[in-house]
Design a protein with these regions (language model features):
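Noncatalytic regulatory segments and standalone regulatory/sensor domains
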Residues: 105, 117, 128-200
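Short secondary-structure junctions and interdomain/linker hinges
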Residues: 74, 78, 107-110, 196
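Intrinsic-disorder-associated interaction segments
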Residues: 60, 93, 178-181
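Intrinsically disordered, low-complexity boundary segments flanking structured domains
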Residues: 68-73, 96-100, 154-156, 174-178
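Cysteine-nucleophile protease catalytic domains, especially the papain-like/related folds used
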Residues: 1-89
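Active-site-adjacent substructure of cysteine-protease-like catalytic cores
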Residues: 85-141
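Long non-globular sequence segments
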Residues: 26-27, 31, 116, 199-200
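A residue-identity detector for tryptophan
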Residues: 41, 70, 101-103, 161
């Protein structure tokens, strides 16, 4: 049985929530190993704010890169059929024929660093859709007020997506909602099953 994808629990935990949602998206509840869930929460929210409070700047790029490496090694050695890859800079692009695009077409998913209200944010990309759109699950699930075209709300697919966004918008270099921003700050964590089972 597949789990519904979940919203973040605070203003700061979009990173680990998206990693957890990647596992929920790819695997049946009965397949998920508790050690995977524990490790996601242990490694997330590793930053400190100016006042020295843990987690108040969310999850660092270093932690997300580490989690991609950890997923890959855990998949190789612990009987959990998962693989992951961390893409950054120019490699972190959502374009037809690109690496991230292919992983989504083959049933994988990608945790993407983007912007929301000009603040860094993570979302989970889950599907390539018609009309040049990508399906994604935004864990900050408030009813948005989209002021420009290219983004829309999806209802009734709690195990897969709650937004559809044109891929050209994802690749923008500004800080508009769901844009990845400048090349230097881009991150994609690609995650997929390695046993060939369908994720839908």
């Amino acid at each position: 049985m597949k789990n519904d994808l979940i919203s973040q629990s605070s203003e700061y935990d979009c990173g680990p929530t998206c990693l957890l949602n990647a596992v929920r998206f790819l695997f049946e509840r009965e397949e998920i190993q508790p050690g995977v869930l524990k490790h996601i929460w242990v490694m997330g929210n590793d930053t400190y704010c100016e006042k020295g409070r843990l987690g108040f700047h969310g999850t660092s790029r270093a932690a997300m890169r580490y989690m991609a490496d950890w997923f890959r090694e855990y998949g190789k050695h612990c009987g959990f059929p998962v693989d992951a890859e961390f893409l950054s800079g120019e490699d972190a692009a959502m374009v037809p024929g690109g690496k991230a695009w292919k992983w989504l077409e083959e049933g994988g998913c990608a945790v993407m660093r983007c912007f929301a209200d000009k603040i860094p944010h993570y979302v989970l990309l889950t599907a390539i859709l018609p009309e040049d759109e990508v399906g994604l699950f935004d864990p900050y699930d408030e009813e948005p007020d989209f002021r420009e075209p290219g983004r829309r709300v999806i209802h009734g697919q709690p195990k897969k997506m709650n937004r559809a966004v044109r891929y050209a918008l994802l690749n923008r270099e500004d800080e508009s909602d769901y844009a990845m921003g400048e090349t230097a700050v881009r991150e994609l964590i690609l995650i997929r099953r390695t046993d060939g089972k369908d994720t839908v």
